[in-house]
Amino acid sequence: ALVFFIRPLNIVFGTMNSDLSFKQKMLLAWLAPRGIVAAAVASYFAIELEKNGIDGAQLRAMVFLLIAVTVLSAGLTGSFVANLLGLKRKSDQGWIILGANAVARALAKLMKSNNEEVILIDENPSLCRMAEKEELKVIYGNGLEENILLRAEVDLRKGAIGLSENEEVNMLFARRTKEVGKVPRTYISIKRDDEGVTADMVDEVGAIIPFARAIDLEKWSLWVRKEQIETKELIYDNKEEITAENAFDKETEGLILPLTFLHHTTLIPIGHNSSIKKDDKVGCLVRSEKLEQFHDWLSQSPFSISS
């Protein structure tokens, strides 16, 4: 009676003026409350009964047994019931980006436009406000702290991308997301291949270099802030596969910044090891003042502008 009648009735009255859906109320009725109040009250009444010469031990034992059974049943069946009601959050959903700089926001907006959930994390309040103005989800705080990562639901994410202007912090972020959330895919933005955090070091930790190569993130952020870039979508026309780092080599530095990679219906941030196949699409930023140079490169490349 307590589990199937009294507790659900309690939830119905307790959530009467809330915005919870019927299914959410059903889940609450199955999982809550857990019995701490009942335990305290039972102990109090047991003591009072014993003061009056009545054995209260049986009452206390019965209440604690009921609590143990209901907690155990909720723990074992909670996931199943949530899934049955369609309320269980799917794993492998969305991305976390460390940094809310202009490039990070440009990447987040492009991914969001393709129905990918993205959460930015940054300690800079002004950058967080800019992200909010652009209608992006952002968390203010240190992305290396476990509580911040848990707020971003790191354990449910497809991947994590370190895009701060400090490449050592990006490396630590990739490691922390794997430790805390077992994130399957991590990206580490670096400045150069042979100094500081190198490409070999990124490979050693099983991470990926975003943008297909090392980049000067500060310069690209400046160009984005000054609106000196244009967004382009390229389509790969060649039958032979090519890796992103070969497709966007040193000739494209300061000219093109590849951001995303679309294969069939799956969009992910492009990495140095992304394998580009025929009809795959690459979302990128192009310097406005170098459009002529971009078109010259395009005419000799295996890409064309997606219509």
PLM feature segments, named:
Residues 9, 16-23, 27, 38, ...:
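Cytosolic regulatory regions of ion transport systems
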Residues 1-4, 28-35, 67-68:
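Transmembrane helix-bundle signature of multi-pass membrane transporters/permeases
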Residues 1-14:
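Transmembrane helical segments that form the transport core of multi-pass membrane transport proteins
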